[in-house]
Structure formats: structure tokens, C-alpha cells
Amino acid sequence: MAKFVISPHFRLHEWVAEEKGYFRDEGLDYEFRDVFKTHATPDRVGAYTSFEKGRETNVSCACHWTVNVAASQGLGKMVADCYSISPGGVFVPPESPIREPKDLKGVPISVGHQSGSHYSTLQALEQYLPREDIKLSFADGILFGRMEKLIDRQVPAAALFSGPYYFAEQLGFRKVIDTTFMMASMLTGDPDPEDVRKYFRALRRAQRDIDLRPELHTRHYAKEFPQRFLGEIDTRRWGPGERIVFEPYTREVFEESFKWIAEREIFEPGTMGAGRFEEACISLAQRSDERTPA
């Protein structure tokens, strides 16, 4: 039987579950595989593009908006049993004159195209600016790519999450506005449903460990961080980042999110799929006779 292929996606959970042996305890035969070979991606290439190309994994993550549309297009199945919350923010250099969200009017903000930073930056800034005054740049790479350009002062502002969020804080970069957003999981290929359950049971245990003693686990950020910065990052100062919420991603949330994306024309009209929850999503919730390991 083929291995269950997992993409960690810049968070702590998979690394904690591996180190603690939680996948092994479940009897899961797995391997980790990166979705993105480089973060210096071309203009308008982001999370959705990777789903269109075809992710060589059985389970991976992205923002819930992109997973919503990708699943609606038949590019995989959105897991409806849980979601996660990722701290995020728009950062500027410490010497920048930009101090308030309204100061971002007309300023190019580096985000990933059709990725979490794209949607969440719009969602946050619409409270302050009309849409025509929000200027997003899609040409600066995905997460680590745009972080590096911000640090090198090649871009005036960038949306960051996960380790780069905490590294920017460590370096004294200023968060102008919070852009915390929801993540979701996508199943691709044809994984065994029981393997998927094993995976999420292991992540549930890892989440508890991270909640209890985050300082023991933030070192795992280094495993996906660019080599250039490994001598500079101090993960002891960083927070736990993304948190998995084992509550349903409901039909109402799915439909509201699909409508929100369509209203902002983030995708060309007619290219988002049918937006039917029952076709796009799958529930693999534990049966009542199953128990999470202690």
C-alpha cells in the first residue's frame, strides 16, 4: 500500500506529531512532502495555482477560501470536520512612515495570489479603505519569498503568517493591521479514509501538546525556514502560530465564504465551480465507538 503523503504547511503540528510518535502510534505509514519547491514564485502564482497543477500529497492545507474554491472545482475534497486559525498581519519596516491602516492607501502590499494573505488582507483593510484604494502586489513570491523581500527593503509592506510573522516581530518590523484567518485541509488523490482519521487523531494530540507547552515546540519552525536566516531566528521568542479547531466547517460557513469570494471577483466570473457544499466537502468524523488516544 502507498504511503500517506502529508504536506506540513509551515506549522508545528505535523512536526510535533512525528517527534512524539503520534503517527506511529496510529499505525500510519506516511511521508512528508513539500508542495512548493521554491517561494520565489512568478507573478500571480499562489496556493490555488498549486491545486490546479495538482498537489502530490494526500492531505495538505491552505486558507479556507482557496480550499473552498478548489474543492468546488473538483480539485480535491475539503475536510469539513475541522479548520484552523492562523495569526497573520501586514508588516512594514520599523523606519516606515506607515503607522495606521489608513496609511496603506495606494501602497503595494505583497501577498500571495489567491492565497490566504490575498483574501485576509482585503478582509482586514476593507474596514478602513474602499476596495479601489487597496493595492495588492502578487509579484513578490509566496510566504518566505515576500518575507525576504520585506527584510531586504525591496517591498514597502507584506502580509505574513506563521514563522515569518514572528520573525518580523523579532526584527522590530511593525504590524499595521492584524489579518488572522481560517485555514482548511484538502484531500487529494484517493487516500484511505482510515488513514485520514489516523492523521487527524495524531494532530489532535499534537495540538494539546502545543497548547500546554508551546515553548517546547516552537523550535520546529526552523525545519521549514530559509537557510539564510537560521543563524538569526530565535524561536524561543515566538508563539505557537496556527491552531487547529476540531469543530465543523459548516455548510453556512462554506456558502458565506464562497459568496464573499465571488463578490470581490478574486476569480474570473464563472471559474469558481458550483459552490455546492455536499459535492466539495467530506466528513470523516470519528464513529461514536472510536476514542482519541490519551
Give the location of each predicted region.
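Positions that flank functional sites
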Residues: 38, 67, 165, 183, ...
